Structure formats: C-alpha cells, structure tokens
From Swiss-Prot:
Transmembrane segments: none annotated. This is Ribosome-recycling factor. Responsible for the release of ribosomes from messenger RNA at the termination of protein biosynthesis. May increase the efficiency of translation by recycling ribosomes from one round of translation to another. It comes from Pelotomaculum thermopropionicum (strain DSM 13744 / JCM 10971 / SI). Keywords: Cytoplasm, Protein biosynthesis. Belongs to the RRF family. HAMAP family: RRF (MF_00040). InterPro entries: Ribosome_recyc_fac, Ribosome_recyc_fac_dom, RRF_sf.
C-alpha cells in the first residue's frame, strides 16, 4: 500500500517536471523554437485552436520562425493571434507564410524573463512539496488505521523525501540551464 502511494507521488512529481519544462520552453530566450507558439491560440471558425494544429512551424535560421498554414484563409487569424500574444514578436506575412524574426533580447527583457522563470521554478517546487505533504498525510493515516508500523511509516516518509529532493534538484537544474540560455548574448 505504501509502495503504491510512493509510486503515485513519483508519477505526480514527474508530471510537475513536465509542466515546468513546457513552461520554460514557451518562454522566448532569443532563439527561435516552435515551442514559442505553443500557447498562441487562433480563433478558427469560432473555436480557439493552437497554431501548431493549423500550420507547419519551421526554424530555417536561429532567429527566424516560419509559420506555414495548411489553410491559407486562416493566415490573417494566425497573424492576429501572434500580435495579441505577449511574445513581443511582430509577424511579417507574404500571403502564403508568416515570418517571425526573433529580436535580440534587451537587458530589461532578460531581467523580466529571469523573474518569470524563477517564479515558474518556485511554483514547480511548491507543487512537488505539496505532493510530498499529501503523500505523507496519506501514509500517516494508514499508520493510524493500523495498516503499517511506525518503522514502515518512517521508511516510506524517507523515501518520499528522497523523491522530493531529487525532483526539486531537477527543477533547479532546469532553472540554471534556462538562466544560462537567457543570459547568453
């Protein structure tokens, strides 16, 4: 029973790491990546639809994204959605494709991004700690109900703590990698 709770906690912690990775990938660090457009939603026949479901997104150069819609009629809508997004990128359209030149990051924008990624990392750490707390509470209630001994409880809590430490360390590692990426001129 304790093993199942620990496996569930680890699974939830892995999901938290994936969320943090996605959050970091969607932040512009001066380099073009299709993940930048993951959160951009286009009003497609009245339905909010992600850009990557309406177009092919390619990276021909380090600072250039090319968005090639499969349906040319949706091109103006994609352009509008990119303008409305908080990416700080102005789309240039030639009627067939949209080109997004990724500008060099300013010092202010870098500082802003640093704050954002630190906040996202802290949210990830808090989520992992909450998973630890919930798992420990479930373990304690099992011990109270007589389903496990105090030694088993202590062993299980130590295992949950090791998982917590490991995944928080992983978030810290992701954070430092992203910080280096942002500070790279």
């Amino acid at each position: 029973m304790a093993g199942e709770l620990i496996k569930e906690a680890e699974s939830n912690m892995k999901k938290t790491i994936e969320v943090v990775k996605k959050e970091f990938a969607s932040l512009r660090a001066g380099r073009a990546t299709p993940a930048l457009l993951d959160k951009v939603m286009v009003n497609y026949y009245g339905t909010p639809t992600p850009v990557n479901q309406l177009a092919n997104i390619s990276v021909p150069e380090a600072r250039l994204l090319v968005v090639q819609p499969w349906d040319k009629t949706v091109l103006p809508e994609i352009e509008r959605a990119i303008l409305k997004s908080d990416l700080g990128i102005t789309p240039a359209s030639d009627g067939n494709v949209i080109r997004l030149a990724i500008p060099q990051l300013t010092q202010e924008r870098r500082a802003e991004l640093m704050k954002v990624i630190k906040k996202k990392a802290e949210e990830g750490r808090v989520a992992i700690r909450n998973i630890r707390r919930d798992t420990n509470e479930q373990l304690k209630s099992q011990q109270k109900d007589g389903k496990m001994s105090e030694d088993e409880l202590k062993r299980s809590q130590d295992e949950v703590q090791k998982l917590t430490d490991r995944y928080i360390k992983e978030i810290d590692s992701l954070l430092s990698t992203k910080e280096q990426e942002i500070m790279q001129v």
